[in-house]
Amino acid sequence: MQPFIAHTGLAVIIDSANVDTDQIIPKQFLSKVTRDGFGIHLFHDWRYLDDAGDQPNPDFNLNKPRYKGASILVSQENFGCGSSREHAPWALADFGLKAIIAPSFADIFYGNSINNGLLPVKLTEAEVEQIMAEVEALPGADVTVDLQALTVTSPSGSVFSFEIAESARHNLLNGLDAIGLTLAHGDAISHYEANLPAWRA
């Protein structure tokens, strides 16, 4: 997992509440167990007019030229609700998104995102609305998410603070997933195992 320190990028708006994991990555694309290759199916039922994915929906923001290359998604409350499929953050990350900004997230999606290096940022509804308005008004303008400083900077330069658990922040800053976190304590684990009584080893 790559460390997340700060990221500046183009933001794309999905101005909907209760975006669920079946909308993020529909169930027919869940047969893979590796993390790659899901980006093409992200928001499939919204991005395409046909089941095969051959006819892009020109009205969906991710298909609009002004949002090409977007790496930050801004949405409304309860993002990532629904089933607990880890494929949802996989699809978002595989598409190239680095951070999701919303007033609230479903708890399981929030944890899955952090575990997969995708930063979920909680701002107030008013702050999210301001960022959306600025992104809409200023095509090509960037948003900055700074995990070190715990701030989001809007296209106009407004700075908003956000909170995240220190353990999650540490893992993201250092690029540590569950395996990486275990390996980081490898010496302590080895020392503990070496000192186990023979009957417990």
UniProtKB/Swiss-Prot annotation:
Catalyzes the isomerization between 2-isopropylmalate and 3-isopropylmalate, via the formation of 2-isopropylmaleate. InterPro entries: 3-IsopropMal_deHydase_ssu, Aconitase/3IPM_dehydase_swvl, AconitaseA/IPMdHydase_ssu_swvl, IPMI_Swivel, LeuD. It catalyses: (2R,3S)-3-isopropylmalate = (2S)-2-isopropylmalate. Coiled coil: none annotated. GO terms for molecular function: 3-isopropylmalate dehydratase activity. The gene is leuD. This is 3-isopropylmalate dehydratase small subunit. It comes from Shewanella piezotolerans (strain WP3 / JCM 13877). Gene3D superfamilies: Aconitase, domain 4.
